[in-house]
């Protein structure tokens, strides 16, 4: 017997400027995972599709299904600063969540829309786009606080074996508690077992979670929003702060000799130069290109305005 899974979210709409910031962040480092938080709103889409004809009973059934559609709209993202840089692990501190909630409240006042933290994203450099058991368990923890919370993963630095070209894959997921029959229905690879145990009436029960993929759609934008632009500009600053923190933490050790300190300083300088070449330089060039494009568009609009004014004066 098939088990019906009730999804808290049916779709995610990610605006293209927020997608651009996530992509730039994921491609900023090849050795460690990066992370951030998504700011947006959760809407109940109650619109029905009038392109098809249904009978009365079918229409009621379709209307009930449509009324249940919940869509997460992601308008911007917040790039988080990593206190612990590890190859296969990212962590979000309560202080960062609190700061993100404060930023969401500021954006809500600025836009007049109910903005809040609706999800998180992180990168998978050189590995599969599918979430690990740690990702699924972390997502389940966030959903205990908010059922509409979603997780995004960007798999980057993946090379296609046939074409020898790089690829970037992305997915959106949520966690659900695995049914007892999940293993027999889908096989052991379709769910992830958590190592967390909870005590119920003196007995320990292992919680199992499985991922469920959420359809994600990129919403095109002609321009980049102010908030996303600020996040993109903030990326080099955050990467530089992470390098400074790591260098100061090592440099403060008292048992290091002079040669080791000189070596650490050289590594620190090399990392900063690499960031300038890989992140700051392309970002600056992109901003200059956008500025030139906007100025060209402004000149075209001014010329069009003058032509329309001339036509208007000739009619008088």
UniProtKB/Swiss-Prot annotation:
Where is Zn(2+) annotated to bind? 122, 124, 135
- Lineage, top-rank taxon, reads Eukaryota
Q: What is its EC number?
A: 3.4.19.-
Location relative to the cell: Nucleus; Cytoplasm; Cytoplasm, Cytoskeleton, Spindle pole
Query: What residues bear Phosphoserine in this entry?
Result: 258
Q: One GO CC term of this entry?
A: BRCA1-A complex
UniProt remark on cofactor binding = Binds 1 zinc ion per subunit.
User: Which UniProt key words apply to this protein?
Assistant: Acetylation, Cell cycle, Cell division, Chromatin regulator, Cytoplasm, Cytoskeleton, DNA damage, DNA repair, Hydrolase, Metal-binding, Metalloprotease, Mitosis, Nucleus, Phosphoprotein, Protease, Ubl conjugation pathway, Zinc
Describe the location of the MPN domain by residue ranges: 12-179
- GO molecular function annotations of the record: cysteine-type deubiquitinase activity; metal ion binding; metal-dependent deubiquitinase activity; metallopeptidase activity; polyubiquitin modification-dependent protein binding
Tell me which cofactor or cofactors this protein depends on: Zn(2+)
Provide the primary localization.
nucleus
Q: Which CDD domains has this protein been placed in? A: MPN_BRCC36
Residues bearing the modification N-acetylalanine: 2
Annotated Pfam families: BRCC36_C (PF18110), JAB (PF01398)
* Entry's Gene Ontology BP terms: cell division; chromatin remodeling; DNA repair-dependent chromatin remodeling; double-strand break repair; mitotic G2 DNA damage checkpoint signaling; positive regulation of DNA repair; positive regulation of NLRP3 inflammasome complex assembly; protein K63-linked deubiquitination
Give the function comment from the record: Metalloprotease that specifically cleaves 'Lys-63'-linked polyubiquitin chains. Does not have activity toward 'Lys-48'-linked polyubiquitin chains. Component of the BRCA1-A complex, a complex that specifically recognizes 'Lys-63'-linked ubiquitinated histones H2A and H2AX at DNA lesions sites, leading to target the BRCA1-BARD1 heterodimer to sites of DNA damage at double-strand breaks (DSBs). In the BRCA1-A complex, it specifically removes 'Lys-63'-linked ubiquitin on histones H2A and H2AX, antagonizing the RNF8-dependent ubiquitination at double-strand breaks (DSBs).
Q: Which family does it belong to?
A: Belongs to the peptidase M67A family. BRCC36 subfamily.
Q: What is this protein called?
A: Lys-63-specific deubiquitinase BRCC36
Gene source species? Callithrix jacchus
Lineage runs:
Eukaryota, Metazoa, Chordata, Craniata, Vertebrata
């Amino acid at each position: 017997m098939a088990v019906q899974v009730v999804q808290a979210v049916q779709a995610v709409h990610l605006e293209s400027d927020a997608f651009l910031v996530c992509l730039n962040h994921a491609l900023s480092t090849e050795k460690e995972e990066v992370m951030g938080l998504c700011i947006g709103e959760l809407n109940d889409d109650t619109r029905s599709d009038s392109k098809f004809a249904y009978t009365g009973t079918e229409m009621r059934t379709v209307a009930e299904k449509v009324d249940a559609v919940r869509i997460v709209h992601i308008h911007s993202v917040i790039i988080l600063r990593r206190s612990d840089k590890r190859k296969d692990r990212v962590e979000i501190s309560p202080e960062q969540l609190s700061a993100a909630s404060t930023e969401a409240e500021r954006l809500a006042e600025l836009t007049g829309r109910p903005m809040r933290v609706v999800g998180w994203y992180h990168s998978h450099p050189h590995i599969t786009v599918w979430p690990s058991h740690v990702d699924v368990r972390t997502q389940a923890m966030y959903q205990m606080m908010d059922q509409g919370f979603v997780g995004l993963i960007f798999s980057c630095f993946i090379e296609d074996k046939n074409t020898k070209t790089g690829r970037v894959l992305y997915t959106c997921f949520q966690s659900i508690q695995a049914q007892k029959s999940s293993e027999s229905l889908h096989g052991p690879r379709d769910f992830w077992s958590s190592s967390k145990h909870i005590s119920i009436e003196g007995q320990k029960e292992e919680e199992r979670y499985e991922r469920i993929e959420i359809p994600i759609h990129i919403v095109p934008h002609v321009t980049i929003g102010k908030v996303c632009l600020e996040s993109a500009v903030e990326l080099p600053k955050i990467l530089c702060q992470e390098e400074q923190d790591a260098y100061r933490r090592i440099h403060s050790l008292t048992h290091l000799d002079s040669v080791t300190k000189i070596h650490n300083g050289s590594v620190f300088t090399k990392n900063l130069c690499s960031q300038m070449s890989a992140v700051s330089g392309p970002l600056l060039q992109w901003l200059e290109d956008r500025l030139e494009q906007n100025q060209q568009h402004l000149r075209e609009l001014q010329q069009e305005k003058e032509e329309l004014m001339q036509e208007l004066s000739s009619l008088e």
